UniProtKB/Swiss-Prot annotation:
CDD domains: GlcN6P_deaminase (cd01399). One of its GO terms (molecular function) is glucosamine-6-phosphate deaminase activity. The active site is at residues 62, 128, 130, 135. It catalyses: alpha-D-glucosamine 6-phosphate + H2O = beta-D-fructose 6-phosphate + NH4(+). Pfam families: Glucosamine_iso. Belongs to the glucosamine/galactosamine-6-phosphate isomerase family. NagB subfamily. Keywords: Carbohydrate metabolism, Hydrolase. GO terms for cellular component: cytoplasm. PANTHER family: GLUCOSAMINE-6-PHOSPHATE ISOMERASE. It comes from Lactococcus lactis subsp. lactis (strain IL1403) (Streptococcus lactis). Catalyzes the reversible isomerization-deamination of glucosamine 6-phosphate (GlcN6P) to form fructose 6-phosphate (Fru6P) and ammonium ion. InterPro entries: Glc/Gal-6P_isomerase, Glucosamine6P_isomerase, Glucosamine6P_isomerase_CS, NagB/RpiA_transferase-like. This is Glucosamine-6-phosphate deaminase.
Length: 235
């Protein structure tokens, strides 16, 4: 696991863009994408670049249950706003949070990932160590699944909604086993509130209680983080 320390999200976004360019030059065709505040500057860098994605496929990590793509808090809306609206792809896949049969939708999404193996996956990390919506206690072998969001995640995401009561309680998320199949993983983290999770992920034992720690078992992980996020690392 390689750790790159940056001054801020702007520098992190630029480094992320450079890593993506190298991966695309080496033939990457499928990108795994994340949402939330962490990758926004990275997406800004992509939008302002000359990269062409018209022959590329994207596969997103997750989506809230109950929100359709027109809802401004859905992850499809987020991706359209920050990336897809400016940089067209050959195809964009996200879980359908409005599916009548959520378990069937999870199986369908696994099939999409099987048909579009992820070459380059971007991740954020939650304060509790979640990646995607894989909360503490999630089995390592799980693929796409329906998740009951933990209270800490609901509280962390409440700032995006009118009130905490409006935050969806469930999501469909790519599983840890799905994420681990990605050829290359780049995880971004900014701010002191991520320091405990980063320490556990990089230096702690691999445990389901800190889902991101499973990344220690992946051969190609790069962490892009600011000084605050790496402040608890011993090396």
């Amino acid at each position: 696991m390689k750790v790159i320390v940056v001054k801020n999200q702007l520098e992190g976004g630029k480094i992320g863009l450079d890593l993506l360019k190298k991966s695309m030059a080496n033939g990457a065709k499928t990108l795994g994408l994340a949402t939330g505040s962490t990758p926004v500057e990275f997406y800004n860098q992509i939008v302002n670049s000359d990269l062409d994605f018209t022959d590329m496929v994207s596969v997103n990590l997750d989506e809230y249950v109950g929100l359709d793509g027109s809802n401004d808090q859905s992850y499809r809306y987020f991706m359209t706003k920050h990336l897809f609206g400016e940089k067209p792809f050959k195809e964009n896949f996200l879980p359908n949070g409005k599916a009548a049969d959520l378990e069937a939708e999870a199986k369908h999404y696994d099939q999409i990932i099987e048909e579009n193996p992820i070459d380059w996956q971007i991740l954020g990390i939650g304060q509790n160590g979640h990646i995607g919506f894989n909360e503490p206690g999630t089995p390592a072998e799980i693929t796409t699944h329906v998740v009951d969001l933990q209270e800490s995640t609901i509280k962390a995401n409440a700032r995006f909604f009118e009130s905490e009561a409006d935050v969806p309680r469930k999501a469909i998320s790519m599983g840890l086993a799905s994420i681990m199949k990605s050829k290359n993983i780049v995880l971004m983290a900014y701010g002191k509130e991520k320091a405990e999770a980063i320490k556990g992920m990089v230096e702690g034992e691999v445990t389901t209680e800190l889902p991101a720690s499973i990344l220690q078992n992946h051969a190609n992980v790069t962490v892009i983080a600011d000084e605050a996020a790496v402040s608890l690392l011993s090396k």
